[in-house]
Amino acid sequence: MNRKGFTLIELLIVVVIIGILAAIAIPKFANTKEKAYIASMKSDLRNLVTAEEAYFADSIKYTTAISCVNPAPAGSVSFCTTQGNTLGAVTTGVGTQAGWTTNVTNTNTSKSCGIYIGAVTPTAPASAASPEGAPVCQ
């Protein structure tokens, strides 16, 4: 008698091994979406820094007017956030040449990211202890 195939024990061992591998792998990928939301918020803040600095180079001042149309109306910066991200109010320091600060939130996470440039009181979660121009998330 020459039977071909796997025994029930062999199949059961394979299922157990797959279960063990899944138990190890799933926690490593559990917060992947959270990391992606944070990365999109940081990216938006870095892109806003670029837009504000370009505006500053032309106007010798920062602006608090952000517009999601291109070309931007006079006195504003053309900038659109990633889908799901919401930009907080952009505030400048004493005088529009001093600097600016803002934060961004995402509808899918409770975390937020903030940034500041220049001599301005940073918007949370950024703080005076955080590096200038670097997005800070918490």
Over which residues does each language-model region extend?
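Compositionally biased non-globular segments, especially hydrophobic aliphatic-rich helices
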Residues: 10, 39-42, 129-131
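Periplasmic/extracellular, small/polar-rich flexible segments of pilin-like filament-forming proteins
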Residues: 50-138
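N-terminal single-pass transmembrane signal-anchor helix
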Residues: 1-29, 33
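Aliphatic-rich helix starts adjacent to a transmembrane/signal segment
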Residues: 28-45
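Intrinsic-disorder/low-complexity peptide segments enriched for small residues
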Residues: 6-10, 43, 85
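Conserved catalytic core of two-component sensor histidine kinases
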Residues: 15, 42, 49
